A protein has these predicted regions:
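Alpha-helical transmembrane segments of integral membrane proteins
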Residues: 2-4, 13, 95-130, 144, ...
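Hydrophobic alpha-helical transmembrane segments of membrane transport/permease proteins
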Residues: 15-66, 159-180
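Membrane-water interface segments at the C-terminal ends of transmembrane alpha-helices
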Residues: 22-29, 59, 67-70, 134-165, ...
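Short, hydrophobic secondary-structure boundary micro-motifs
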Residues: 36-38, 63, 78-81, 147-148, ...
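An internal, D/E-rich "acidic patch" concept
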Residues: 58-114
Length: 313
């Protein structure tokens, strides 16, 4: 196990190095000049050149990349071009809404989708199964921003049950915090619920067809005991895999969701940085999101051995 973890951590470092290079190269080649945006419309060429020199944008690509990597190795993600604040500080100010939204969505999605998938597999071919699968197809089909606007029009504007936008810290109370996250979580988590439900159902159907499950049923074990104690436990690995992969859905969906619901999170910060070509923020956020995704999938891989004794590292 230890050797496997060390090997995976080493590969994670390589992946993050490649991601860092690709992100920096893509932003370097992206059309547009942040110096011209900072200088304004009435700036002269000399003003723009002066800003280039100040930001180091007049240096060769490898020199800029090397300087950025050196700062990154010391925990410095750079400084925002427009606010002149450290990127780590800006991300720290915005991290609570994003973490609250993604964690709440993840927990609710797992709590809803796994039972739906199990019930659909146990009642395969019935109206209940067809209803669950129809919901899954619908969940995949509706884009996040479309569902978000439908929820806003229905529950925030027409019924006036929930706030349209904004965020309240959990320090202000659980209910105010939750009220501002219900609609964003539904909009963000619907496609995630649909995905996990389909995978859970397919994995359960495969396990329920195995001989050892039929043997357990023939011994007279209770249906719930067969489903939970035998079938679900052995079907857990594919479900855990899709949960880890789905983190990418949550991260990308959070950017859209935070923009629609005006949540002051990292996703909203990223959109603002893209519109202003604030490259240090874009680079820092991309690296952090990539690291979270890689580490979550590493944790999922390591947890396989906990649910399936046949897996050894």
């Amino acid at each position: 196990m230890i050797r496997y973890v060390i090997r995976r951590l080493f590969s994670t470092v390589i992946v993050m190095a490649v991601v860092a290079f690709v992100v920096f190269a893509l932003l370097y080649l992206t059309p547009g000049d942040p110096a011209a945006i900072i200088a304004g419309d009435i700036a002269t060429d000399e003003d723009i050149k002066r800003i280039h020199a100040k930001l180091g944008l007049d240096e060769p690509f490898l020199a800029q990349f090397g300087r950025w990597v050196w700062a990154l190795a010391h925990g410095d993600l750079g400084t925002s071009i427009f606010t002149n604040l450290p990127v780590t500080q800006l991300i720290g100010q915005r991290i609570e809404p994003t973490v609250s939204l993604t964690v709440l969505t993840l927990l609710v999605a797992i709590a809803v989708s796994v039972p739906l998938g199990v019930v659909a597999a146990a009642r395969a071919g019935t109206w209940l199964d067809r209803g669950v699968m129809a919901f899954s197809v619908l969940g995949f089909s509706v884009p996040v921003f479309v569902l978000a606007y439908i929820l806003i029009l229905t529950f925030a504007i027409e019924l006036d049950w929930l706030p349209v936008q904004g965020y309240r810290s959990i320090k202000d109370g659980v209910w105010p915090w939750l009220r501002h996250l219900i609609l964003p979580s539904i909009a963000l988590g619907t496609v995630y619920v649909a995905l996990i439900t389909r995978i859970t159902r397919a994995s359960m159907l495969d396990v329920l067809a195995q001989d050892y499950v039929r043997t357990a049923q023939a011994k007279g074990l209770a249906p719930d005991q067969v489903l939970i104690g035998h079938a679900l436990k052995n079907a857990a690995v594919p479900i855990m895999t899709i949960v880890g992969i789905g983190v990418a859905l949550l991260i990308s969906g959070a950017i859209v969701t935070e923009t629609v619901f005006a949540l002051p999170g990292i996703g909203r910060l990223t959109v603002d940085a893209i519109l202003r070509r604030d490259y240090p923020i874009i680079q820092g956020v991309t690296l952090i999101f990539s690291a979270v995704y890689v580490l979550v999938n590493l944790a999922v891989d390591l947890s396989y051995a906990l649910v399936d004794p046949r897996i050894r590292y």
